[in-house]
């Protein structure tokens, strides 16, 4: 069996930061990919949160 090569693209999970701080039940998460070579630090994107019904900051979790 051939060994699978590790690519530069990895799948990451983005989680809403404002949802955790508010104490409301539920969580808003998105799955996306990033290039490990070009983006070494953690991703931080503005995405829509359907529970809060507005755009919030989503950070990469491990």
Curated annotation (Swiss-Prot):
Question: What is the protein name for this chain?
Answer: Large ribosomal subunit protein bL33
- Return the similarity comment: Belongs to the bacterial ribosomal protein bL33 family.
Which keywords does this chain's UniProt record carry? Ribonucleoprotein, Ribosomal protein
Q: Name one GO biological process term.
A: translation
HAMAP family for this protein: Ribosomal_bL33
The answer to whether the entry has keyword Ribonucleoprotein is yes
Any stretches that span the bilayer, and where are they? Answer: none
- Gene3D superfamilies in the record: Ribosomal protein L33
Q: GO molecular function, one example?
A: structural constituent of ribosome
Q: Which organism is it from?
A: Phocaeicola vulgatus (strain ATCC 8482 / DSM 1447 / JCM 5826 / CCUG 4940 / NBRC 14291 / NCTC 11154) (Bacteroides vulgatus)
Is Amino-acid biosynthesis tagged as a keyword? no
């Amino acid at each position: 069996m051939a060994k699978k090569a590790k690519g530069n693209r990895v799948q990451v999970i983005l989680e809403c930061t404002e949802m955790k701080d508010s104490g409301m039940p539920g969580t808003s998460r998105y799955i996306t990919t990033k290039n490990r070579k070009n983006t070494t630090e953690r991703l931080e994107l503005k995405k829509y949160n359907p529970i809060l019904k507005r755009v919030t900051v989503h950070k990469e979790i491990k």
